[in-house]
């Protein structure tokens, strides 16, 4: 799907705000060392898919922590953004880092 510049700005704004909230406002240790890799906000801004990465061993822990903290993150996000609607947050694991590591490992083995 093609994104316009305003859509990219909205997605980046959402990513920056959520990353800041995790860094400064959420004290759950299970959400430490989590990286927000991207956001996709729907056209009407009612839904925001939030992509994150974490260590493989912590996938389930982090998913549960996001489920518990999503309401708090949403309310803090609504305060910081001047959008009419606070979007529903859907946290999704970004497996692109895992894929990149797997490819790099395969290339390293082949080169050796």
Give names to the regions the model predicted.
Residues 1-49, 53-112:
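Charge-rich, low-complexity N-terminal segments
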